Amino acid sequence: MQGGGYIKKELIRMKLLVFGATGKTGRALLEQGLAQGHAVTAFVRNPAALEAQAGLTIISGDVTDAAAVSRAVAGQEAVLSALGPRGGNYGVLPGGVQIIIAAMKQAGVKRLIHVSSYGVGDSLAQMGWVSRKIVVPFFLRKALDEKEIEEGIIRASDLDWIIVRPGGLEDGARTGVYRCITDPLTKVGQPRIARADVADFILKNLVDEHFLHQAVGLTY
């Protein structure tokens, strides 16, 4: 689906806050967001991991620090979450998602786009045998269980949320050509997509309401 199936609109420049900005998907969000003229704030534990750039504000903090998250969220127009566990440190991020949501409510920021994964919830049934019987249960179970908790927290909020479920993440250039799947009966086999195209989808949905309050699978 070219460009996610959207009518081309005039670019809207916004104030964006990115969590997970030092990961590969987060970096793709920073690169494309800045290239589009957005004012981007990266919330990171290690500011030295990012280079200073025009239009980029780097804030040091931990997602479990409610005061730091609240300061970062204040004044933003959308929050983009590309958070993922590091080094098998599970159990932390669902609490971080709760803190982000609370900060957004306090600041009056409505749009949250959160990166989850194929294999979470009803999307597991869409995947091929190898993914369902081998890859997910033996290699991804803990990570996807945590993502499912995060999705539940987001769904229970009154924010304008979109959950993004990419297939297997790859390096590669942005193509703008991928499938956006919301029908749980659609079979996808072994889904895959470049991180750059995940960022492309997210940035195309900063104000669009087509996928509002839905989990969207992304794959080629």
Annotate each PLM feature:
Residues R86-L112, D145, I149:
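NAD(P)-cofactor binding segment of oxidoreductase domains
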Residues F43-A48, D62-V63:
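N-terminal Rossmann-fold cofactor-binding loop
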Residues L16-Q36:
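N-terminal Rossmann NAD(P)H-binding glycine-rich loop of SDR-like oxidoreductase domains
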Residues E151-G172:
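Conserved beta-loop-beta element that borders a ligand/cofactor-binding pocket
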Residues V73, E77-L80, I113:
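N-terminal Rossmann-like NAD(P) cofactor-binding module of classical short-chain dehydrogenase/reductase
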Residues T57-Q76:
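Conserved Rossmann-fold cofactor-binding substructure of NAD(P)-dependent oxidoreductases
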Residues D122, A173-Y178, N205-Q214:
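Glycine/proline-rich active-site loop of Rossmann-fold NAD(P)-dependent oxidoreductases
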Residues G5, K9-T22, V109-L112, P184-Y220:
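Mid/C-terminal beta-alpha module of Rossmann-like enzyme folds, strongest
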